Regions:
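Conserved flavin/dinucleotide-binding core of flavoenzymes
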Residues: 34-82, 136, 204-206, 413, ...
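N-terminal secretory signal peptides and thylakoid transit peptides that target proteins
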Residues: 1-18
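C-terminal motif of bacterial Sec signal peptides marking the signal peptidase cleavage site
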Residues: 24-25
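Conserved beta-strand->loop/alpha-helix structural units within folded catalytic cores of enzymes
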Residues: 92-107, 122-125, 397, 425-432, ...
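Active-site/ligand-binding neighborhood in enzyme catalytic cores
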Residues: 244-395
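N-terminal glycine-rich phosphate/pyrophosphate-binding loop and immediately adjacent elements
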Residues: 73, 81-263
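Mid-domain catalytic core of redox enzymes
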Residues: 385, 389, 393-523
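Glycine-rich active-site loop/strand segments that organize a redox cofactor
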Residues: 47-56, 130-161, 312-333
Length: 640
């Protein structure tokens, strides 16, 4: 039944001062310092509501209103301004995109060419960081943080030398990672504590049925797996099949030879295996898809059996010899999941550290990793004429080309004004799919390569609660919710790093972090890329009111039996809409195997004169360290 949303609820969830935010720009007249009150670390007065400070904005964030319309007019209809105001601004380097690749490219260039190098970074959003967005909430003098996108730092051992040096330069090295691990509570499953209690929640007759313990371990035949499965509101026959799958009671591929098994797991979808070989009903599949759909952004219909197993899906014990052969791959995948660390605002702190290195005046008092989470950022300092590096927000690039003066002209639109700037070099750190529209002079094969991949959409929501009383009674910090709009529900990262003081008990206000992937539903004949396009449309076309309704209903059903009342306990809602999320990773069921150097992302990322490309799309992998590698490559191309 729909939940009635009062006017107060709407105001709590609406974007506070959105009009002022979009119109205020980054002018000198806006003061953005957040005064720190005397007392415990992490205790703040709320920011001045008239100040330009995007992290405290609630309502619809991510690809927010005003960030995508100009680009869509260009990409969908070929429309852009005919005339531009030529600004008297020339730079050594212009970077299009202030996400991780863009910020890293600017930093690599600054380090190589000197602090006096003139750099301009343009971004269409009202905040920097790309997917690494910071969501900030205030209540009763306390600040609460959560992540609005990119979450974690993978093990530095997997970083290239260039990426490791970049991280070390902002204070993140092996010693700091170890410190972060020590500061991460053992019960915080979201931040890589895989031994922590984590559960599953399914709708029942009287609200959600929650099963605690360690559900992830249960899926691999761990402690109390049978008891956990028997507690699920499922027919006994389905429970029996799940128990067989988790425990490895039988080899579901025993009618195949070894060669046939290997062929099968590389050519058949994971979900088809569950239906045809394990005998599960399609209605049970969401239980087994809930983990991978948020880790990989696609469902078991899109992954082969092998890809599913090595992405963390259940069933490796139930494939006999071939399961043992793939166990090492699965172990490596799970080790990757375990080897993660997280700031309280996700990778937004990494973005803040990079921005402060590029433009020290944005946070002159910040010491580094020890206070990055609580440092006061002055957004009016981002785009100042007297700074060598400038970061210009709310600015959508619509054209990039070399002129006859051995320069790159960059056209962009900022708050309705069409403007042009020039540079000696340009790095495009935006989405691959936009680049052919920015640079129509590119070779056709390069434009085709850039257009091949389709980014994976997500929705990340953060919900500020008056206190943590009801949530604390669930018995775990994270629950998979396979039959709900948001498939993961967790506490926000309560990590005491960067100076942040997280909630200390159930009486403190808290933030609930919720993840949604739209890649659900039955098997489809369409390619995965077409399915991703349809899912992206779903994300774009769903209004905030609908997301708010879904959030309130889901939390009320999950927490209601513990005294939760959405009407009084929810203080604010931030929905981070991410239609263009993870970089497209090639999938065996849909994509051919290309010769080295001939894959679409490799053809697409070729240097184009004074223009280079740096993003995770160009690496076909959605990892921050590869965003840095792409940035390093682009800068090396332009400074060779």
């Amino acid at each position: 039944m729909p939940i009635d949303i009062t006017r107060r609820d709407f105001i709590n969830g609406a974007v506070i001062g959105a009009g002022g935010l979009l119109l205020s720009g980054c002018g000198n007249e806006v003061a953005t310092e957040i005064p720190v009150t005397a007392g415990a670390p992490g205790v703040f007065n709320p920011p001045d509501p008239s100040a330009y400070y995007p992290p405290t904005q609630t309502g619809m964030r991510g690809s927010h209103e005003g960030s995508f319309e100009v680009a869509h007019e260009l990409a969908w209809r070929g429309k852009k301004p005919k005339h531009y105001e030529a600004l008297e601004e020339h730079y050594d380097l212009i970077v299009v995109g202030a996400g991780m690749s863009g910020l890293a490219a600017a930093r690599y260039y600054q380090q190589k060419m000197g602090a006096d190098a003139r750099i301009l970074i343009l971004d269409n959003h009202d905040d920097f960081g790309g997917h690494a967005k910071r969501n900030e909430f205030h209540q009763d003098g306390r600040m609460m943080l959560s992540l609005g996108g990119a979450q974690n730092i993978e093990a530095l051992s997997g970083y290239s030398d260039a990426a490791r040096e970049l991280m070390a330069g902002i204070g993140i090295d092996d010693n700091f990672i170890e410190f972060m691990n020590q500061q991460t509570p053992d019960e915080l499953f979201l931040a890589g504590k895989m031994e922590a209690e984590n559960g599953i929640a399914m709708p029942g007759a009287n609200g959600h049925v929650t099963v605690g313990g360690n559900w992830l371990a249960a899926m691999f035949g761990g402690k109390d797996y049978e008891k956990s499965v028997r507690a699920l509101p499922l027919p006994t026959t389905e429970q029996d099949k799940l128990i067989d799958l988790f425990a490895g009671h039988q080899d579901f591929l025993d009618d195949f030879s070894l060669t046939e098994k290997w062929e099968y797991i590389n050519t058949t979808s994971y979900n088809r295996y569950l239906v045809d070989k394990v005998g599960l009903a399609e209605s049970t599949l969401p239980i087994l898809n809930a983990i991978v759909i948020n880790l990989a952004g696609v469902s078991g219909w899109n992954l082969t059996v092998l890809e599913g197993i090595t992405s963390g899906c259940a069933g490796i014990k139930s494939m006999g010899w071939v399961g043992k052969a793939t166990a090492k791959l699965a172990e490596l995948a799970l080790d990757s999941l375990l080897s993660v660390t997280m700031f309280p605002d996700g990778n937004a702190s990494v973005a803040r550290l990079l921005v402060q290195k590029l433009i020290p005046a944005v946070a002159p008092g910040m010491q580094g990793t020890q206070d990055v989470a609580i440092a006061r950022f002055d957004y009016s300092a981002l785009d100042q004429e007297n700074h060598a590096t400038r970061l210009r927000l709310n600015s959508t690039a619509v054209g990039v080309r070399e002129n006859n003066n051995n320069q790159v002209e960059v056209d962009y639109v900022q708050q309705g004004k069409a403007q042009r700037v020039t540079a000696d070099h340009c790095v495009l750190a935006c989405y691959n799919a936009l680049i052919p529209h920015l640079c129509p002079e590119m070779p056709e094969d390069q434009k085709e390569g850039l257009s091949y991949g389709v980014k994976t959409p997500f929705v990340y929501a953060n919900v500020q609660l008056k206190d943590g009383q009801a949530y604390s009674k669930l018995g775990a910090t994270l629950f998979q919710c396979p039959y709900d709009p948001f498939q993961w529900v967790s506490t926000s990262p309560a990590v005491a790093v960067g100076g942040y003081e997280p909630p200390r008990g159930p009486d403190d206000p808290m933030v609930v972090f919720m993840m949604r992937s739209p890649m659900t539903g039955p098997e489809q004949p369409a390619s995965c890329r077409d399915q991703l396009r349809m899912a992206r449309h779903t994300v774009y076309s769903t209004p905030f009111d609908d997301y708010e309704q879904q959030i309130r209903q889901q939390l009320q059903s999950l927490l209601g039996k513990h005294g939760f009342n959405h009407e009084t306990d929810i203080q604010a809602i931030t929905v981070n809409r991410i239609p263009h999320g993870y970089a497209y990773a090639y999938l065996s069921l849909y994509d051919p195997k290309w010769e080295e150097g001939q894959a679409p992302h490799e053809i697409g990322r070729a240097q184009f004169g004074r223009i280079s490309i740096a993003n995770t799309d160009s690496e076909a992998t959605a990892l921050m360290n590869l965003a840095f590698d792409a940035a390093w490559r682009a800068v090396e191309e332009q400074t060779a």
